Design a protein with these regions (language model features):
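Enzyme catalytic cores with a strong preference for nitrogen-chemistry domains
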Residues: 1-350, 358-369
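Conserved G/P- and acidic residue-centered "switch" motifs that form tight phosphate/ATP-binding loops
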Residues: 354
Length: 369
């Protein structure tokens, strides 16, 4: 039986040292829970919406250095986290040192990488470039690396192979946020990983998607539909890990709502973490009992412990708050976080009697002590 930790942490944008400390605390807590592998969000050290801080070499180097301290802290545990990957010998389109939005995986102080990977980290394949997502401005995607190496991008994707203290092997198919939202792209990282697994006869025990996904009304329901379909089609559990917090790129201020979720191999939700809460939650996986004519039963299922014995974890009904409730929760959390980040303790509102000022006054009345 394997214990996977859902590391839904609050990330402070532009503060790698504070985020490093948060991650180290999460790792120590995970060790106390006897978790085998802790999964953390995308760009967990830097934050996601940080604007042109990516153009500052000192900031990027600090993110890399803080990542190295995380790697060193992985004695007796595996940790998967998002950070910036750096290749100082090459340049981005803007002439600055080449950066990647990347997944790092470490165990017992050493990096774990797919044998196909051209770097000691996993590069994001699909970089979004719409609305306030502007990754193409700062990061080089995997297809560009494949083109430079004169290799198909499929060859550079692979699994993270872990071996835990009980001798169990556990193969993870790693994806970064947009890599799962591939319906409008010509290439599907998810399908590629699944096809390679089948061809090479190497099982995928879980798909993971680490994300920095801002709150958008209705997005959680769309996400559930996406990952339910993927888990059911692939007959494999899916772990979606998102961050919480407030981030600001200078133009847009976004709340990150978490709601990290685990889907079993039937696409059913078995765990969903609360919105806007920082939490490390263990999830048990147990090998499925063999069933005739079902090759997938060489895999793992989501489990509960009952009287010390693993049982199948049942699906849960996830209540969907009303749209006004979701909007209010996002506004309340966002205002509270913004005041905390800026140190503002008092608000002056010119109340005109109109709906705008009245709504603001009502909102701040619920936020201010």
């Amino acid at each position: 039986m394997i214990r996977i930790g859902m590391g839904q942490i609050e990330i402070v944008p532009g503060n790698p040292r504070k985020n490093r400390d948060t991650i180290l605390q999460a790792i120590e807590y995970a060790k106390a829970l006897r978790i085998d592998s802790l999964i953390l969000p995308e760009l967990a050290l830097s934050g996601y919406l940080i604007g042109d801080a990516w153009d500052q070499p000192a900031f990027v180097n600090e993110c890399v250095a803080m990542g190295e301290t995380i790697i060193k802290a992985t004695d007796n545990i595996a940790v998967i986290f998002g950070n910036v990957g750096l290749d100082p010998d090459k340049t981005n389109f803007d002439g600055r040192p080449r950066k990647f939005n990347a997944i790092f995986a470490a165990q017992n102080g050493e990096l774990i990488t797919p044998q196909e990977a051209p770097y000691p980290f996993i590069i994001k394949t699909l970089n979004p470039n719409y609305r306030f997502f502007n990754e193409a401005r700062y990061f080089t995607p995997l297809p560009i690396v494949a083109q430079e190496l004169h290799r198909p991008v499929e060859e550079l994707l692979g699994l993270l192979p872990f071996t835990f203290k009980n001798g169990e092997t556990f193969n993870v198919a790693p994806l970064l946020c947009e890599d799962s939202w591939d319906e409008n792209y010509s290439f599907s990282p998810t399908t590629t990983l699944a096809d390679k697994s089948a061809i090479q006869n190497v099982p995928i025990h879980a798909f993971i998607n680490i994300s920095a996904s801002p709150f958008t009304l209705g997005k959680n329901e769309r996400r559930h539909r996406l990952f339910t379909e993927r888990a059911r089609a692939l007959k494999t559990p899916v772990f979606y890990i998102n961050s919480v917090g407030l981030q600001n790129n200078g133009k847009s201020i976004c709340t990150f709502d978490g709601q990290s979720t685990v889907y079993n191999r039937f696409g059913e939700i078995v765990t969903q973490l609360p919105a806007y809460e920082s939490i490390v939650q263990p999830v048990l996986l147990d090998k499925l009992k063999p069933v005739a004519n079902d090759d997938s039963c060489a895999m793992y299922g989501i489990a509960d412990l009952k009287d010390g014995h693993p049982t199948v974890k049942p699906a849960v009904e996830v209540p969907v708050p009303s749209e006004p409730a979701q909007i209010y929760h996002a506004l309340h959390y966002g205002l509270q976080s913004f005041l905390k980040q800026t140190g503002i303790k008092k608000i002056v509102i010119g109340v005109s009697g109109g709906i705008d000022s009245a709504l603001n006054a009502a909102l701040y009345a619920t936020v201010l002590d």
